[in-house]
Amino acid sequence: MNTTEKIIVKENKTLKLNNVLIREVSQNELVDINKISYMMDSYIKTKGNATVGPMINYSSAEGDENGQVKIVIKLMVQLKNPIHNIDKPYEFKSQIRITNCLFGRFSEKEENLQFAYSKLQVHAFENDIKLKGDSYTVFVNKNEEKLVADVFMELDKGGTAIEGL
């Protein structure tokens, strides 16, 4: 039996990112997400900059004007230095700070990553914690056997719990 915990959950954690380059990924671009990631790296190099740390994936669900659920996905990387004069489709934020998050450290095969999100949602449900409905996934380390990822889910500042989408 494996005694290593696959998903460790902690409450009241803070996600802090500095010099963040952000690229929103549209629904029809999802199949090209690896290409988009490569293009981000190329863009950073053409600006004479370099990344610090791993890729971060932001996701949330929003309703559109027709009442349809739209999934929002953004790729983010931290940079060594700020970039000025950002070109579309990129945006830059000097700092992103998300306080009071539910946190999960996932250490398992990449195809099982969805269980980290599920475990955090179940933990929130069992402890009457209201989640905002978005998540930040920091891809800490990856090899052939396993992925280590940190998942941050922002708590809702009041209001009702997010219903299943």
Which positions does each model-derived feature cover?
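A solvent-exposed interaction/effector surface
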Residues: M1-L165
